[in-house]
């Protein structure tokens, strides 16, 4: 028989006030206390919005308006649970049963995502690398991978390979922006020589000269095409559902994108690491050289590479930045947060919502919860 779990810690109002005075951000839900100090900078609504509610009951805020939080967001909150509030005056506790009853009326299909994470009883052993474990989850993988957690992930046993699977955000502009500048300078010089022509691989009679004035347009075309590629990869590759009986396809999905949905605030896994990125970028470059004349394909590629850099930087900012309310980035962040926590089958655009508009995959205005 398993031992009974230890009783929850309890805190008096004066103890909570001391922590608040020291700069901690504690909130409560009924009598349940949560320490959100480490989460405030990640809060989708902004740090100030959360700090303004320090010490308060957030039950009503979870239900909105202006925003009704998803079951995944409520489950995420439980990872910051620290104990119970004791010695509270009766008047301030009168509404607790009502608040708890309302917040628990979630869509039954979403109820499993509301469960608190028990690290010792989870489907995987978090003390070991996850990549070799997830393939055994089978039919449970899809539900498990879309239950986000607050802790970082380790994929590999080898420290070297593990290191290559992670990176800091600023490695992306440091490595790839100089390449964008070099390619742009090199191919513009080629255009300036006046020898660039289209269709030379098919005919010598009907070729079309490409003047250097076309360089900016081709570059911008590459950036625009990247936004479409970004959307298509995210929607059809990253969000494919691997067969439950395929150990290796589940592993592949997890290493490509599942890990990010499992640990959305693992800062070392938010942008594409340079080594695997080099392989993918190299394939794109070769494809452009095969399809188009060298200078034309290279220019489109350079624009696309800049689009990739902007995508990765935008993605990182959407997770860790605090855009001003009402700004485009604020709207984009809300769009992406809903993709992670409520609507994983929509909201595939990262750097722009353009293609979500075009293909009708915008995240709904309301989270996937039935209002009461």
From Swiss-Prot:
Topology relative to the membrane: Multi-pass membrane protein
GO molecular function: 4-hydroxysphinganine ceramide fatty acyl 2-hydroxylase activity; fatty acid 2-hydroxylase activity; free fatty acid 2-hydroxylase activity; heme binding; iron ion binding
Cofactor remark from the record: Binds 2 Zn(2+) ions per subunit that likely form a catalytic dimetal center.
Cell membrane keyword on record: no
Subcellular location: Endoplasmic reticulum membrane; Microsome membrane
Annotated Pfam families: Cyt-b5, FA_hydroxylase
Binding site for Zn(2+) 1: 234, 239, 257, 261, 339
Induction summary: Up-regulated during keratinocyte differentiation.
Residues spanning the membrane: 168-188, 213-233, 268-288, 290-310
Enzyme class of the recorded protein, top EC level: oxidoreductase
Catalytic activity: a 1,2-saturated fatty acid + 2 Fe(II)-[cytochrome b5] + O2 + 2 H(+) = a (R)-2-hydroxy fatty acid + 2 Fe(III)-[cytochrome b5] + H2O; hexadecanoate + 2 Fe(II)-[cytochrome b5] + O2 + 2 H(+) = (R)-2-hydroxyhexadecanoate + 2 Fe(III)-[cytochrome b5] + H2O; octadecanoate + 2 Fe(II)-[cytochrome b5] + O2 + 2 H(+) = (R)-2-hydroxyoctadecanoate + 2 Fe(III)-[cytochrome b5] + H2O; docosanoate + 2 Fe(II)-[cytochrome b5] + O2 + 2 H(+) = 2-hydroxydocosanoate + 2 Fe(III)-[cytochrome b5] + H2O
Any one Gene Ontology BP term: sebaceous gland cell differentiation
Pathway: Lipid metabolism; fatty acid metabolism; Sphingolipid metabolism; galactosylceramide biosynthesis
The protein's required cofactors: Zn(2+)
UniProt cross-references to Gene3D superfamilies, sorted A to Z: Cytochrome b5-like heme/steroid binding domain
Domain of life of the source: Eukaryota
Cystine pairs: none
UniProt domain Fatty acid hydroxylase: residue ranges: 219-361
Residues that coordinate or bind Zn(2+) 2: 260, 315, 319, 336, 340
Family: Belongs to the sterol desaturase family. SCS7 subfamily.
Function: FA2H is stereospecific for the production of (R)-2-hydroxy fatty acids. Plays an essential role in the synthesis of galactosphingolipids of the myelin sheath. Responsible for the synthesis of sphingolipids and glycosphingolipids involved in the formation of epidermal lamellar bodies critical for skin permeability barrier.
Implicated disorder: Spastic paraplegia 35, autosomal recessive, with or without neurodegeneration: A form of spastic paraplegia, a neurodegenerative disorder characterized by a slow, gradual, progressive weakness and spasticity of the lower limbs. Rate of progression and the severity of symptoms are quite variable. Initial symptoms may include difficulty with balance, weakness and stiffness in the legs, muscle spasms, and dragging the toes when walking. In some forms of the disorder, bladder symptoms (such as incontinence) may appear, or the weakness and stiffness may spread to other parts of the body.
Comment block on domains: The histidine box domains may contain the active site and/or be involved in metal ion binding. The N-terminal cytochrome b5 heme-binding domain is essential for catalytic activity.
Protein name per the record: Fatty acid 2-hydroxylase
Organism annotation: Homo sapiens
Gene label: FA2H
